[in-house]
């Protein structure tokens, strides 16, 4: 009977203990805040976990710890636990503990947990006597409450009127037109600036119509209707890219019959008004007269005066006509290229016409203001498109061997070439270099344009110890270098190719000479490796050279040899 009563009492105590364990502040360990305490610290009356119970036993003095599920509690112990618990223990043992100033240790480290428990129980660092615990707890609660209220009131949003006061002026938004007026004025100013720099504003209008004069330097920039049509002082680049500028001085030999101007080099001309700017005639090509020494074909001694007098007819009345058409030079160039196609056969590149230049070049008059602007270019076209005498795409083969530097007259040819019989072989000009001496009349005439004394060596094949050029295919043509080592340069006569002479821009020879003929007689074109008969060299620098293969002494008058 007594045993059953005791068992019932223990069950009642265990139930009361479990009820205390279920309280909110007792659900965690008092020392490490771990959930689900399993032990009770009977020394202080707190609920702790298993790990902290072992640490509490190691303190000095050791704490008395009991298991909740494996031990029995007396009525006095249950009453003690009811009076204490984790909440009361916190007020006593952690009454002075500040969470902000005191660091909570890492409870995963047993050493730190032990040190924390020693500070807490042995040294009583944060201990408060039980009679003062409630007062201190109430004070801390009031302090924490006031701090919490202050921190919560700090981010509180207050009305603006409370800060400015009742006498603050009213703030009006989105009403001020003065605040928008600077923006409008700025946008209008930007539009005006954009109008000044609008280059493509008048594409729909006539580009050749005379526009309204503008005083700004950038008003007529890239406006192609302003070529020489406005006053020079209105723009810094009044004459920029003026294509009336293909003129030379009247005394010089003109290349393609471009109209000339009588003013001096780099002298500003006042076509549209008084020139008030230094760059008024910038890139004005009328200001660049050519000297007679820089003209093409000026090496000729017998034709230079003739061409100067003949082609000078093209340069007429250009300087005095300030209102002439801007594209008259181009029109003359077009006439030069298109006129005078009458002849035996048309040529593609370097044709030689029969008619002289004077009869081909048509000189249009620039007396009217509406004359063609491409006149000078047309005249140049007529000069280059003179009557041809051969169907060769590059040069003529009628009793003349044309070269880039001049013709090489010879007396006779072992193999007669019919005039206009067919295209000449490639490089068919024997010794056409004006800077070397003429070769002799022997059968081994050298065709090397850079050789001075040709030696008639026998034909050598590949692998010979010579300084000659590599041999080709076909009939061997002898090619010797200026050194003592000589070999053979076997070059086949290519029937589809011919030499490359310059175009004839001056007086035409009857049998079709090259561009710069130098007034010499016309030789006969021979194949590349054939023998050229004795004759007088057309080299202007080798007039007195002997005809032998090995000229001796100072017989050569070439200043470059």
UniProtKB/Swiss-Prot annotation:
Residues 11-135 form the Arf-GAP domain. O-glycosylated. The modification Phosphoserine is found at residues 167, 181, 362. Keywords: Cytoplasmic vesicle, Developmental protein, Differentiation, DNA-binding, Glycoprotein, Metal-binding, Nucleus, Phosphoprotein, Repeat, Spermatogenesis, Transport, Zinc, Zinc-finger. PROSITE patterns: ARFGAP. The modification Phosphothreonine is found at residue 177. Transmembrane segments: none annotated. Residues 176-191, 442-451 have a biased composition (Polar residues). It is found in: Nucleus; Cytoplasmic vesicle. A zinc finger (C4-type) spans 29-52. InterPro entries: Arf-GAP_FG-repeat_protein (IPR052248), ARFGAP/RecO (IPR037278), ArfGAP_dom (IPR001164), ArfGAP_dom_sf (IPR038508). GO terms for biological process: acrosome assembly; intermediate filament organization; spermatid nucleus differentiation. GO terms for molecular function: DNA binding; GTPase activator activity; zinc ion binding. Glycans are attached at residue 367. Contains FG repeats. Interacts with EPS15R and EPS15. Interacts with FCHO1. Required for vesicle docking or fusion during acrosome biogenesis. May play a role in RNA trafficking or localization. This is Arf-GAP domain and FG repeat-containing protein 1. It comes from Rattus norvegicus (Rat). The gene is Agfg1.
